[in-house]
């Protein structure tokens, strides 16, 4: 049974709210995927903070009209699942990682920072480390000289203690 007009308006409003806060939209064709696999994908998306949903393409076109994602409208053909996220790489990463293990999920397109991405662009976006990973790397780089300096001071103090004891 199809959606009535009120249901369609509610879906467009819900997707519009997600898109308003989003930095990235990733789109994939899901034809032939088992329900259990799709449920697993949804669970991974929830863990990553990605809004993942199968939607009617016409409703998505209405929701993304007059947004930075409007260029994606031409790519919305066929049975698609949409990943929408505030994190710049999360949606692309969730769909790309799942597509690596399941050949029935085919990445189609995406949009980031007002640019429409093809399949290769979505895969490239997915390969970028997340913000948390980048911050952890930066912290490690900043912490390394301090740690080295502390080890040097400790070794120097130990050497002086040995000289005094001798």
UniProtKB/Swiss-Prot annotation:
One of its GO terms (cellular component) is ribonucleoprotein complex. It holds the Pfam family Ribosomal_L10. Part of the ribosomal stalk of the 50S ribosomal subunit. The N-terminus interacts with L11 and the large rRNA to form the base of the stalk. The C-terminus forms an elongated spine to which L12 dimers bind in a sequential fashion forming a multimeric L10(L12)X complex. Forms part of the ribosomal stalk, playing a central role in the interaction of the ribosome with GTP-bound translation factors. GO terms for biological process: translation. It comes from the Bacteria. GO terms for molecular function: large ribosomal subunit rRNA binding. PANTHER family: 39S RIBOSOMAL PROTEIN L10, MITOCHONDRIAL. The keyword Ribonucleoprotein applies. This is Large ribosomal subunit protein uL10. Belongs to the universal ribosomal protein uL10 family. Keywords: Ribonucleoprotein, Ribosomal protein, RNA-binding, rRNA-binding.
């Amino acid at each position: 049974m199809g959606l009535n007009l009120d249901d369609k308006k509610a879906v467009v409003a819900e997707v519009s709210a997600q898109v308003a806060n989003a930095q990235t939209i990733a789109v994939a064709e899901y034809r032939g995927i088992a329900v259990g696999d799709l449920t697993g994908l949804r669970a991974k998306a929830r863990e990553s903070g990605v809004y993942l949903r199968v939607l009617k393409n016409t409703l998505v076109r209405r929701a993304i009209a007059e947004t930075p994602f409007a260029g994606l409208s031409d790519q919305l053909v066929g049975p698609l699942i949409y990943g929408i996220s505030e994190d710049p790489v999360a949606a692309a990463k969730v769909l790309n990682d799942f597509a690596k293990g399941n050949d029935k999920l085919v990445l189609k397109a995406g949009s980031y920072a007002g640019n429409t991405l093809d399949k290769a662009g979505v895969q490239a976006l997915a390969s970028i480390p997340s913000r948390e990973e980048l911050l952890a790397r930066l912290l490690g780089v900043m912490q390394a000289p301090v740690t080295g300096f502390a080890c040097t001071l400790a070794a120097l103090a130990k050497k002086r203690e040995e000289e005094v004891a001798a």
